[in-house]
Amino acid sequence: MNTLKVVAPTKSHRSGNRLKGLGIAVSIAIAAIAIYALTHTLKSIDTNEVFEVIRHTNVSLIALAATLVITSYVSLTFYDLLALRTIGRTDIPYRIAALASFTSYPIAHGVGAVSLISPVIRYRIYSHNGLSAFDVANICFLTGLTFWLGNLTALGIGLFFAPDAISMVDFLSAKVNQWLAVALLLGVAGFLSWCWFPRNIGTKRWPVRLPSGPLVLLQIVIGVFDLGAAALAMYVLIPAGPNIGIFPIMAVFIAATLLGFASHTPAGIGVFDATFLIGLGNGDKEPLVAALLMFRLMYHFLPFIFALSLFGVVEGWRSLGRRRDS
């Protein structure tokens, strides 16, 4: 007679479920607070003035911002290229890394489920070039590492040189923010020192090779360059009136990016915008709202549409090829 054996959940399984539940709760809380703050902030906005600011924005500044956005997305492609070199897949050409990067990032961030969508898109592209699911998991981990190293370094720099900028967001004094900046930069430097000689993490069955020190340094440079280009795009779109420096914009921009990422809302919508307006909106907010609208069009909406179309064309072409072969 067969009996059904009931296996009790392990302690690690229960703690994992608790952490997952806590993460969901934090994401919902961030999104709810941000949407409330954004709604409250936008009540006093004169929409006619916002569109007037957009209409009077110099075409050359829009072109410069677009160039900086393109530069940011080009630098993103090196996230994947570095990850491929780290796992020893030097045979994968740059064009494949660029395709995987450019399709996965805008689509995943546009949908909001980055940790779910990005690996699926990367696998669809890399599996046709001989990479396994484990290889793709390694690439996702390493590109995420580049993202966090770049963000934390740039945030540390921005906080150190403009500690007051983020005080409206984290409610900490300028002095505390400067110490936080030092802690962030020391943490990144410590990780760089720890990785200077090749290391593996994970298990014997599933080892994950960390990049060596020089590659980690390159990851940091690429990550900061990517974020710096994006922050500069926002900077040039803000009219001269608010008189906001590049370091405050960098600090608030990265804080807004990280909070938007943590909220899992599509393109950080609501969260990114509220953080940006609260962090920089001491005066008239109409110029900032105008800059936000133009930036979102350039950095989020158009790349999302283009990446979605490109991925659809690639998948359609491959499907057509399979039909011909059969």
Where are these regions (language model features)?
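Predominantly cytoplasmic-facing regulatory/coupling regions of multi-pass membrane proteins
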Residues: 1-102, 151, 160-261, 283-326
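Generic hydrophobic, aliphatic-rich segments that mediate packing or membrane embedding
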Residues: 50, 79-83, 98-103, 118-122, ...
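Transmembrane helix boundary and interhelical junction motifs in multipass membrane proteins
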Residues: 74-80, 112-122, 229, 247, ...
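Helix-loop junctions at the membrane interface of multi-pass solute transporters
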Residues: 85-87, 123-130, 279-281
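Hydrophobic alpha-helical transmembrane segments of multi-pass membrane transport proteins
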Residues: 94-128, 260-263
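Membrane-interface alpha-helices at helix entry/exit sites of multi-pass transporters
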Residues: 95-99, 114-117, 128-144, 284-295
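Mid-bilayer segments of alpha-helical transmembrane spans in multi-pass integral membrane proteins
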Residues: 105-114, 144-156
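Hydrophobic alpha-helical membrane segments of integral membrane proteins
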Residues: 125, 137-140, 145, 152-156, ...
